[in-house]
């Protein structure tokens, strides 16, 4: 934490900064206090703890103070936060440890199983970002993916469709959708 504060401020500051830290919606008060204490120890003057779905809603331009419910699904790298927000606070929420990194791993497994192709996490993430889909789309996109052929050990290029990414991500997506349903109930 201290490293990031110094990196953001450089050597030009004389005052300790005010810092907002985002935490997943499911963290306990003890965990929030630990994050707050660590931030103070790293050099903060003032610390605000904000739940990630609230920060995501504000970042998306949603007026969270209104008396209407807004569902936020924040899929990060390591966790996904699902929340219903109204009147400036969280009405109901859930946080699961299934997120973007799991999508990448699912794509790596799919490419290995379906195409006998070994690809790295970076290639999987690139594929996810460029043509990844969690539902069948009217227009199918394609991308050439390079990796190592697991049979010959030689480099190989495979043309992958957005339909294949939907298949690769189906199970992981279903777990997030299941959590969305539980939040709505």
Located regions from the model:
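Nucleotide/phosphate-binding catalytic cleft detector across ATP-hydrolyzing
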Residues: 1-75, 83-185
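Conserved Rossmann-like nucleotide-cofactor binding loop
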Residues: 78
């Amino acid at each position: 934490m201290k490293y990031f504060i110094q990196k953001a401020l450089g050597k030009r500051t004389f005052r300790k900064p005010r810092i907002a830290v985002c935490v997943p919606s499911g963290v306990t008060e003890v965990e929030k206090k630990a994050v707050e204490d660590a931030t103070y120890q790293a050099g903060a003057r003032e610390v605000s703890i904000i739940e990630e779905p609230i920060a995501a809603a504000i970042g998306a331009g949603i007026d969270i103070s209104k008396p209407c419910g807004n569902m936020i699904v924040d899929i990060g790298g390591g966790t996904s936060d699902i929340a219903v927000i109204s009147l400036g606070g969280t009405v109901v929420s859930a946080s699961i440890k299934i997120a973007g990194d799991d999508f990448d791993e699912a794509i790596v497994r799919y490419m290995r199983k379906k195409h006998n192709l070994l690809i790295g996490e970076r290639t999987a993430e690139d594929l996810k970002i460029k043509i990844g889909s969690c539902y069948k789309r009217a227009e199918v996109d394609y991308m050439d993916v390079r990796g190592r052929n697991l049979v010959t050990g030689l480099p190989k290029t495979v043309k992958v469709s957005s339909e294949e990414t939907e298949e690769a991500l189906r199970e992981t997506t279903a777990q997030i959708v299941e959590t969305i349903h539980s939040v709505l109930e």
